[in-house]
Design a protein with these regions (language model features):
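Conserved acetyl-CoA-binding loop-helix of GNAT-fold acetyltransferases
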Residues: 56-69
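Conserved GNAT-fold acetyl-CoA-binding loop/helix
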Residues: 1-5
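Conserved GNAT acetyl-CoA-binding A-motif
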Residues: 71-84
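A conserved beta-strand-loop-helix scaffold within acyl/acetyltransferase catalytic domains
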Residues: 8-25, 30-49
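Acidic/histidine-enriched, beta-strand-rich ligand/metal-binding domains
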Residues: 46, 55, 91-94
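Extracellular/lumenal ectodomain signal focusing on beta-strand-rich modules
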Residues: 47, 102-105
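Conserved active-site alpha-helix within GNAT-family acetyltransferase domains
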Residues: 84-103
Length: 110
């Protein structure tokens, strides 16, 4: 997207870092992606979201690649891990991640 900018934001309290995609033509936040820097040199890749009107335009990939390049430049020697949906798995495998156990979400209202 021509009018898209990505801003990097860090938090002090929770060790979270995020990137936000902004459509400059209307100042709308159209996507975000997070990571959590943990103890013992680990980083957990967290959720990502893209506004429904902006999906299928490469914004998720752009956010993911921006975060990935940042990690490669700033966290050499860290172990990166993620819990991901089936739709995100091909990108993680493309980047050299190895799959672990399959986990199934369950819930019950009581």
């Amino acid at each position: 997207m021509e009018n898209l900018t990505i801003s990097h934001i860090t938090t002090n309290a929770q060790n979270l870092e995020m990137w936000v995609a902004i459509d400059q033509s209307n100042s709308l936040a159209v996507g975000h992606i997070f990571m959590n820097v943990e103890k013992d040199n680990k980083i957990k890749f967290l959720d990502a979201w893209v506004h429904s009107d902006y999906r299928r335009q490469g914004i998720y990939r752009l956010l993911w690649e921006t975060r990935w390049e940042y990690v490669l430049e700033n966290y050499k020697g860290y172990t990166i891990y993620a819990w991901c949906k089936e739709t995100s798995l091909p990108l993680l495998i493309e980047k050299g991640f190895e799959t672990g156990e399959i986990v199934t979400y369950v819930e019950k209202k009581i």
